[in-house]
């Protein structure tokens, strides 16, 4: 992938090519299928619909970190390395013009809290390199 092999890691939401931006989300689906969780996204989205969101507008970035935690919880897998490889844990201020214009600030605290949450679950790492999965 152009994103994974880029000389400098880019924040996933700032990847210009929408198809490259979607790859990690599809790889999570492929991984879920491989471990036998066929209804992963259906269950995840149902859960999200029934929970209060973590922010709107520029604060909606908090929903992405909730998504990361829930992926790990639903799959009972520590996917920290996967999300890190794809640039989900890049800190800084980012302008994203995708379905609207947003100015996100991703702080080290947000990343630390997400990683700490995942580590506290003691989930195993995936038995395969999820960044290499393709259909």
Question: Where do the protein language model's features map onto the residues?
Answer:
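Structural helix-adjacent loops and short alpha-helical linkers that scaffold large soluble proteins
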Residues: 29-42, 72-84
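Beta/coil-rich, acidic/histidine-enriched accessory regions frequently appended to metallopeptidases
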Residues: 59-135
């Amino acid at each position: 992938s152009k994103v994974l092999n880029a000389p400098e890691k880019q924040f996933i939401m700032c990847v210009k090519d929408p198809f490259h931006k979607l790859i990690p989300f599809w790889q999570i689906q492929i991984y879920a299928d491989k471990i036998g969780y066929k209804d992963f996204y259906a269950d995840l989205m149902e859960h999200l619909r029934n929970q209060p969101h973590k922010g709107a507008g520029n604060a909606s970035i908090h929903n992405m970190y909730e998504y990361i935690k829930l992926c790990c919880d639903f799959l009972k897998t520590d996917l920290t390395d996967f999300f890190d490889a794809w640039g989900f844990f890049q800190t800084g201020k980012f302008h994203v013009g995708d379905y609207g214009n947003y100015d996100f600030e991703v702080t080290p605290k947000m990343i630390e809290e997400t990683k700490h949450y995942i580590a506290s679950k003691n989930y195993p790492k995936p038995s395969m390199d999820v960044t290499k999965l393709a259909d």
